[in-house]
Every structure is written in C-alpha cells, then in structure tokens.
Design a protein with these regions (language model features):
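Small-residue-rich segments of transmembrane alpha-helices in multi-pass membrane proteins
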Residues: 1-2, 43-58, 100-115, 172-188
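C-terminal transmembrane-bundle signature of multipass membrane proteins
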Residues: 108-189
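Helix-coil boundary and interhelical linker segments in multi-pass alpha-helical membrane proteins
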Residues: 2-15, 51-72, 115-140, 186-189
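C-terminal ends of transmembrane helices
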Residues: 23-38, 81-99, 153-168
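Intramembrane alpha-helical segments
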Residues: 2-5, 11-12, 16-56
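Membrane-interfacial loop-to-transmembrane-helix junctions in polytopic alpha-helical membrane proteins
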Residues: 8, 12, 33-40, 63-66, ...
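Hydrophobic alpha-helical transmembrane segments of polytopic
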Residues: 16-23, 74, 143-146, 176-179
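Alpha-helical membrane segments in multi-pass integral membrane proteins
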Residues: 44-52, 70-83, 96-121, 135-152
Length: 189
C-alpha cells in the first residue's frame, strides 16, 4: 500500500521499476534454486538496498545528484565486502582461496577509497558534494581509514579464528557494526 501511495504521489519513480525487477529477480532466482545465502543473492540484495539512496534523492529532488551515486557506490562496495568477509568466518571458514579473495576485495576497496580521497584533496571531485570542499575531503579520507580497517579485519579476524579465537556469528556481527558506523560517518561528511 505504501508503495502504491508513493508512486501515486511521484509517478516518475516508476523509472526505477525495471532496475529493481532485474535485481530482485536475481535474488529470487537464487531462492528458487535453494541458494538464498549465495554470494550472488547477497550482492543482488545489497544492490537493491543501496539503490534506495538515489531513489530517495530522486523522490526528494525529482532528480539525482552526484552525492547519491557516490553513497550508493561506496555503500555497495562496503556491504558486498561485508558479505564476503562474513562468509570467510562462517560458511567458507576453511577455504583459503575465499579468504584470499576477501582480502583482495578489501584491498581494492582501500584503493578505490584512496583514489577518491586524493581526487577530493586535489579538488577534482568536489562537484559530487553539496558540502564544502573541506568536509568532502575529510569524509573521503575517513572512508579510506574505514576501508583500511575493513581490510585489516578481513585478514586478522579469520586468522584469529583459525588460531583458536572464539568468533561466533554474533560476535562477528557486533564488531562489524563498528566498521559500518565508520563508513556511515565518513559518507555523511
């Protein structure tokens, strides 16, 4: 009902329907194939979730500015990495190839964040942000720090677990909340 009311008030939102149909179709296909916890299903769910940022911007403004796409991209990269990392701790905990993939993925996140931070510091990407250049630059460097922390934990926590550390799914989730908070703060600036 809420979706119908929203579309009635802002019919231009229907432009998003095909995108969400594809993304959610992938997730549903994985459920039908009895693989609701697959990496593909998780990524499809992340994409659907982070696309809500530009959808919300579109709803409010009637258009989408660069910061909404920046948020969606960085949140998508971060949360996909979280799925990969959690798999190394639970379903793929003894899979060294998956652990290597996770560490490599998180290293790429650091690199992408670093490129944006350097470009922000040089004033190249200031057009993305409605905020002042200083806050935009600070936020991008905080994102580099959050990405580096996520890279470190993608290596250190599985290593700790392998060496006998007690890492229950609950503990993994609770510690991940701190990293997620760091990413959110960095993006909010």
């Amino acid at each position: 009902l809420a979706a119908l009311i929203t579309v009635a008030l802002r019919p231009s939102l229907l432009v998003w329907a095909p995108v969400f149909a594809i993304v959610m179709g992938v997730a549903l296909w994985e459920v039908v194939r009895k693989r609701p916890r697959s990496l593909l299903s998780g990524i499809a769910t992340v994409v659907a979730s982070v696309l809500m940022v530009p959808v919300a911007d579109h709803t409010i403004r009637g258009s989408i500015n660069g910061i909404a796409w920046w948020w969606a991209l960085m949140l998508g990269i971060y949360f996909t990495g979280t799925i990969i990392y959690v798999k190394t701790m639970i379903r793929e905990r003894n899979n060294s190839r998956y652990l290597t993939f996770s560490i490599g993925y998180h290293a790429a996140f650091v690199l992408i964040s670093l490129v944006f931070a350097v470009l922000a510091s040089c004033g190249v990407v200031t057009g993305f942000s409605p905020y002042t250049r200083l806050w935009w630059t600070v936020g991008t460097w905080l994102l580099v720090i959050a990405a580096a922390i996520s890279l470190f934990r993608s290596w250190a926590v599985p290593r700790s677990a392998h060496n006998g550390g007690k890492w229950t799914p609950k503990r993994v989730g609770k510690t991940e909340q701190l990293v997620a908070l760091g990413v959110d703060i960095a993006l909010a600036l």
